[in-house]
Swiss-Prot record:
One of its GO terms (molecular function) is 3-isopropylmalate dehydratase activity. [4Fe-4S] cluster binds at C347, C407, C410. This is 3-isopropylmalate dehydratase large subunit. InterPro entries: 3-IsopropMal_deHydase_lsu, Acnase/IPM_dHydase_lsu_aba_1/3, Acoase/IPM_deHydtase_lsu_aba, Aconitase_4Fe-4S_BS, Aconitase_4Fe-4S_dom, IPM_dehydratase_rel_enz, IPMI_cat. Heterodimer of LeuC and LeuD. It comes from the Bacteria. Pathway: Amino-acid biosynthesis; L-leucine biosynthesis; L-leucine from 3-methyl-2-oxobutanoate: step 2/4. It comes from Prochlorococcus marinus (strain MIT 9515). Its EC number is 4.2.1.33. Belongs to the aconitase/IPM isomerase family. LeuC type 1 subfamily. Its cofactor is [4Fe-4S] cluster. Catalyzes the isomerization between 2-isopropylmalate and 3-isopropylmalate, via the formation of 2-isopropylmaleate.
Amino acid sequence: MSQDTLFDKVWELHKVANLPGGSDQIFIGLHLIHEVTSPQAFGALKDKNLKVKFPNRTVATVDHIVPTDNQNRPFRDNLAEQMIDTLEKNCFEHKIKFFNIGSGKQGIVHVVAPELGLTQPGMTIACGDSHTSTHGAFGSIAFGIGTSQVRDVLASQTIAMNKLKVRQIWCENKLSNGIYAKDLVLHIINHLGVKAGVGYAYEFAGPAISALSMEERMTICNMSIEGGARCGYINPDEKTFSYIKDKLCSPQNENWDKAIKWWKSLQSNENSIFDDVIKIDASRVEPTVTWGITPGQSIGISQKIPSLGEIHPNDQFIAGEAYEYMGFKPGQPIKDTPIDVCFIGSCTNGRISDLRVAARVLGNHKIAKNIKAFVVPGSERVAKEAKEEGLDKVFIDAGFQWREPGCSMCLAMNSDKLIGNQVSASSSNRNFKGRQGSPSGRTLLMSPAMVAAAAIKGKVSDVRDFLNK
């Protein structure tokens, strides 16, 4: 059983009670909500004549279903208009802070909260979204929850959970030039399998993790859930503190020094005991691309589609289905796979640093004639920064469509969808069957830099060929 890890410390600090059956009642320090998983939860409160327990601990924005092409109200999509109108009314009724379109603070919830300084070390954070683990990059313990638990947090500010085991993933050495956090996390998930993290929290550590920027760390923690882990986190350090400092919601003046001292006390240390430790050599990672229908089905750009015997046992159960759906055969190179659509965005890779690196790859290039390409900033703030730096012009001149903030083609709840059997090069987090809107659409996950390279060539390409020129 783990002891004295950051996870253990934060868990004990937020444990309200031991519950029958072995679970714990955990206080949630920050609750993030959006338009899709909150309406039923608010409806349940109304049915029981309950109010939100701590409105000041809940923050709302709109992201999942918002259109990214035309955000004038009322939306052309009646369902989007209805869902966002409902969230507006619920937040007004319960006095919840709401960052709506046009506020300058709207965007994907897992992009907005960190950039506002809402996400801080030592917090417990919950949201009705699978990728809430993103916030673990700051040394918080962050969980995705279902609608019934959204209701519970609104009503009591607590949830019932079984304590997780803690696995440390120690990433040795450093990533080479042209290799990014997305490549590393896809490599880790492939190495361990998509079910390896069930019942675990993942602590990411080691020289390769320390070398990452905060936005790259968010990419790592964001995809913890894709490896089966309930959450993933990184111990806070000077990079963490520097990122948070002077944000809108960060501690100020004398409270800042107190916060730093407390945050440092939470770090795992040489006395920490983990349930399991896995070592990854980051220097061996190359640009990585998924070939199948789980994020664990990935290979390096120089590799070929694996045979069944070469696939992690946790992923073999779905390999045959992946071969058939994706149209790949064992031994086929992933490089030069033709692409139809390119998407840069999502809570995994829709931040300003992601747009910068993709724009650097694009340079003065134009996208291939057969390619339809989208770039969707993760928030209004990201969009503003990108425009100030001229990044939007780089994308538009290359042939990309520049869109407004939202989840967009990551899950295709709006009109941003694949059509028919189109193949997508995507910087998002899931490549499940039909994930990007078409029942037969196929998704290849990769870094934003790799998406940019694919857009130029019209096929899966090694981004290092562009960076080394």
